[in-house]
Amino acid sequence: MNKALYSTKLGKYYIAKCEDFIKHSKLQGKVQLILTSPPFPLNKKKKYGNFCGEEYKSWFVSLAPLFESLLTDDGSIVIEMGNSWEKGRPIQSLLHLKSLMEFVENKDANLRLCQEFICYNPARLPSPAEWVTVKKIRAIDSFTHIWWMSKNDYPKANNQRILRPYSKSMQKLLSSGKYNAGARPSEHKISEKSFLKENKGSISHNVLELSSINGDDLRLPYSMLSIANTKSNDFYTRTCKKRGFTPHPARMPLELASFFIDFLTDEGDIVFDPFGGSNTTGFCA
C-alpha cells in the first residue's frame, strides 16, 4: 500500500518506485495531466539513478501503458527529455528519439502525439564538453524535447490560458488601427480588419525559451515564450541551504510546469508527476 511522505489539502507526495505506485494506486482513469521530466538517457550513471542505452529505452517504453491507464478520456501526458550522445564519439545518439517514438507507439497503450515543443536554454553550460569546449568541433547542446501526448485527438486544452503579452509593434497597431492589408507573396489575403481584434494577447508558439531576463520584462522579441532562468536564490534553493540539503541537480523550471498546467487542465483536475524530484509540478499545480 502506498503511503504519502507528506500531504496538504491540494496534494500528496510519495516516495516509491513509480511502476509499483501506479499499479497499486486508485488513480486509474482520474488523472487529467501527467507532467514529468524523467531521468534523461545519459551515458553515465548519476546519483539520482538512471539506466543507459537499450536498457533505458526498454524501461521507458514500458511506462507507456501504465501512464495511459491513469488518464481521463481527455487527459494528457507531457514529457520533457534531453538529447543523448554516443559514448566517446562526437555524434548524437538516436536513443532519446527512439525512446519517445516507441513510447507513443507502444501497442499496449492508446497514445498519439498531439504536438512537440522545444525548450531552449541559451544559458546552459557548454555540453558535451569534450566536443564543444575542448576540441571545439560541435555547438552547444542547448534544448530539450517536450512531447505532448494523449489518448484521443482532442484532449482538454485551451490556448487562451497561455497567451503571450502583445509585442510593442502589435500594441501600436491596435492603437492606430492601421496596417498593410491585401495579398501577400505567400498568396494569403489579409483583410482590413484581420489584426484589429483585441484578444488580450497573442497565441503562444511551441518553442519555449529559458533565459536570464529581468523580471520586469514580460517577453523577448519574436515568437518565443521567455522563462526567467534565475534559480540561484529562489525559495527552494534557500530552504535547502538553510536545512543543509543538496538541491536537486535538474529541476524543471516553475514557469514551464505552469505553462502546461494552465494549458491542459482546469482548477480541481488531478495532475501527476511520476518522477517528482523537487516537486516542481506539485508546487505549481
List each language-model region with its residue ranges.
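Core catalytic lobe of class I
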Residues: 1-285
